[in-house]
Structures are given as structure tokens and as C-alpha cells.
């Protein structure tokens, strides 16, 4: 079973940044240190990141991109339709992963339970290092004037220092901003 990762998305207004570490672990062994778990979709208008089984994540990325195309890039509609399929489809139901998605207007967490959640304070964190990254990001968002990219970088570094399934080989993508 592949496990462990940290994906973090931080938003200030229309500036949204999503980052993830590069570690893929099989059991207690690092199988890969430079995986890309965050990517741009929908002609560079949507950010997406995954936590969970690598094979499952690629299936979900492909399905979600199809939903975005079908619904004209409407993130919320695509996310709701994806969650419906994920929950009801016999094959998809077995996939073990979570998706964080965002465009310039909205950030959402999509789970296999059919959940589509808009985060509090514009921060989404998933994966084994998620709680550490979430704590750091919320503190930096509340008490500093750092931009979302700086917050994502700093928070993922904190998660990598604490979570053994998270490394500091980061992939960071952003939309909007200066």
C-alpha cells in the first residue's frame, strides 16, 4: 500500500497556491522522492493535488479532468459530479485517495465518501502531514502578511520536519496573485 504525503492549498482572495511533497512510501521504505502530486488542469485554470495511492490518484485526476471538460471548467459543478461518481461507482468506490482542487474563485476538498467541502480560512491540507501543514498555514495566514506561496513553502517545510512520510522536495503551482 502506498501511503503518506502532504498537500496544502492556501488562498488570499483570488491568489491561490497549492503545493505538495514528492515522497512516495511503500510501507516504511521511500520508493520515490520526487513524485508530482500537484498539477495544473483545465488549460492552467485549475490546481489539483492528491493524497493517497498513486495509481488511484492518476485515475481520479483523469476522471476529474473529464468532469471539468464536460462542465465547461466549472469547478464546483465538476467537483460535485466527481464526488457523486466516486461514491456510487463500484470501481471508483474502492479508490483510496483525496483530492484538493482550486481555481481563482474557489477551493474544494473532494473525498470518496461523497464529500465536497469548501475549507475554512481558505486552507486545505490533506495527507499524513496535513495536520502539521494546516496548523502552520493557519498561524501564518492569521499573524503575518506573507503571500500564499510563502505560506505554502514554510508550512510544507514544517510538515516535512515532523512527518516521516513527507519530504521537502516540493512541487508548487499557483493561480492569480501579483
UniProtKB/Swiss-Prot annotation:
<feature type="binding site">
    <location>
        <position position="166"/>
    </location>
    <ligand>
        <name>Na(+)</name>
    </ligand>
</feature>
<dbReference type="GO" id="GO:0009376">
    <property type="term" value="C:HslUV protease complex"/>
</dbReference>
<dbReference type="InterPro" id="IPR022281">
    <property type="entry name" value="ATP-dep_Prtase_HsIV_su"/>
</dbReference>
<feature type="binding site">
    <location>
        <position position="160"/>
    </location>
    <ligand>
        <name>Na(+)</name>
    </ligand>
</feature>
<keyword id="KW-0645">Protease</keyword>
<comment type="similarity">
    <text>Belongs to the peptidase T1B family. HslV subfamily.</text>
</comment>
<keyword id="KW-0378">Hydrolase</keyword>
<dbReference type="GO" id="GO:0005839">
    <property type="term" value="C:proteasome core complex"/>
</dbReference>
<feature type="binding site">
    <location>
        <position position="163"/>
    </location>
    <ligand>
        <name>Na(+)</name>
    </ligand>
</feature>
<comment type="subunit">
    <text>A double ring-shaped homohexamer of HslV is capped on each side by a ring-shaped HslU homohexamer. The assembly of the HslU/HslV complex is dependent on binding of ATP.</text>
</comment>
<dbReference type="GO" id="GO:0046872">
    <property type="term" value="F:metal ion binding"/>
</dbReference>
<protein>
    <recommendedName>
        <fullName>ATP-dependent protease subunit HslV</fullName>
        <ecNumber>3.4.25.2</ecNumber>
    </recommendedName>
</protein>
<dbReference type="InterPro" id="IPR023333">
    <property type="entry name" value="Proteasome_suB-type"/>
</dbReference>
<dbReference type="GO" id="GO:0004298">
    <property type="term" value="F:threonine-type endopeptidase activity"/>
</dbReference>
<dbReference type="GO" id="GO:0051603">
    <property type="term" value="P:proteolysis involved in protein catabolic process"/>
</dbReference>
<keyword id="KW-0963">Cytoplasm</keyword>
<keyword id="KW-0915">Sodium</keyword>
<keyword id="KW-0021">Allosteric enzyme</keyword>
<keyword id="KW-0479">Metal-binding</keyword>
<dbReference type="InterPro" id="IPR029055">
    <property type="entry name" value="Ntn_hydrolases_N"/>
</dbReference>
<dbReference type="InterPro" id="IPR001353">
    <property type="entry name" value="Proteasome_sua/b"/>
</dbReference>
<keyword id="KW-0888">Threonine protease</keyword>
<comment type="function">
    <text>Protease subunit of a proteasome-like degradation complex believed to be a general protein degrading machinery.</text>
</comment>
<dbReference type="Pfam" id="PF00227">
    <property type="entry name" value="Proteasome"/>
</dbReference>
<feature type="active site">
    <location>
        <position position="5"/>
    </location>
</feature>
Amino acid at each position: 500500500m502506498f501511503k503518506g504525503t502532504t498537500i496544502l492549498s492556501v488562498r488570499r482572495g483570488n491568489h491561490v497556491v497549492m503545493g505538495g511533497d514528492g515522497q512516495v512510501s511503500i510501507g516504511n521504505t521511500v520508493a520515490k522522492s520526487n513524485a508530482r502530486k500537484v498539477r495544473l488542469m483545465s488549460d492552467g485554470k485549475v490546481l489539483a493535488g492528491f493524497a493517497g495511492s498513486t495509481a488511484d490518484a492518476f485515475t481520479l485526476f483523469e476522471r476529474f479532468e473529464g468532469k471539468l471538460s464536460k462542465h465547461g471548467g466549472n469547478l464546483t459543478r465538476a467537483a460535485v459530479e466527481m464526488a457523486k461518481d466516486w461514491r456510487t461507482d463500484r470501481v471508483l468506490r474502492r479508490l483510496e485517495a483525496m483530492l484538493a482542487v482550486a481555481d481563482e474563485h474557489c477551493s474544494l476538498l473532494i473525498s470518496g465518501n461523497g464529500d465536497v467541502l469548501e475549507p475554512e480560512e481558505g486552507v486545505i491540507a490533506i495527507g499524513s502531514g496535513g495536520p502539521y501543514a494546516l496548523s502552520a498555514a493557519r498561524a501564518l495566514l492569521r499573524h503575518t502578511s506573507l503571500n500564499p506561496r510563502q505560506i505554502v513553502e514554510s508550512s510544507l517545510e514544517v510538515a516535512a520536519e515532523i512527518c516521516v512520510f513527507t519530504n521537502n522536495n516540493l512541487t508548487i503551482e499557483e493561480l492569480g496573485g501579483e
